[in-house]
Amino acid sequence: PVSKKRVKHWCLRISKYSDRLLEDLNKIDWPEPLKEMQRNWIGKSKGVSLTFEVENSKNKIEVFTTRPDTIFGVSFLTVAPEYSDLHEICNADNRVSIENYIKKVSIKSERDRLADVKIMSGVFSGSYAIHPFSGKKIPIWISDYVLGSYGTGAVMGVPAGDQRDFEFAKKFNLEIPNIFDKINITESAFSDKTGFKLINSEFLDGYDFN
């Protein structure tokens, strides 16, 4: 049987060569999900870290985003199956379904998980996070499209502006709040993210989305 194990390994100073690596990555004829995995591994990103408190808990979930201006479009958080504090943030009533899901996806490699972008899977943690600005309850989900080895192992779901988040929200009947003025997101997310104004975003309403 095949199993995953933690082993010691060398870490190269990739960030020193990030510009060259990212530039040359565009010349490689690889599937886009694998390229995206490499971009994440190279690690050059400009953005901010946001912290969501877990409801009725001392735990917090930190996410990194390159688009903090979409914060009011967040309708769920997704953590990786191998998220470090997973058992602490999950509701005990959902433990069986969570453990079954983790067992199911544990046999897949990271490459397989990124390659299967059209196959959405996940399980509800039974817990909620608190939106840092609106105070709204945000459901916390577990899905194998998030990798524990990249970033914080958690991402904020903005279905209005990300197609992957849009498809995930559609499959699991999650809210899809529209934050883009005069943009129809009934069939797909607005992935261009340029040239329009923000709506339904409290103090960000009216700002240009560039």
Give the location of each predicted region.
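Catalytic alpha/beta core of large soluble enzyme barrels
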Residues: 83-188, 199
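Conserved phosphate/anionic-ligand binding catalytic regions in large, soluble enzymes, centered on
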Residues: 60-83
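A short catalytic or substrate-binding loop motif that flags glycine-/basic-rich loops and adjacent residues
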Residues: 42-46, 55, 68-70, 119-124, ...
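Short, flexible, solvent-exposed loop/turn segments with mixed acidic/basic and small polar residues
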Residues: 1-3, 66-68, 142-148, 188-191
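A secondary-structure boundary/capping signal
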Residues: 13, 64, 82, 142-143
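Residue patterns forming the tRNA-binding/recognition surfaces of aminoacyl-tRNA synthetases
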Residues: 1-61, 84, 154-210
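Alpha-helix boundary/capping residues
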Residues: 25-28, 78, 92-93, 105
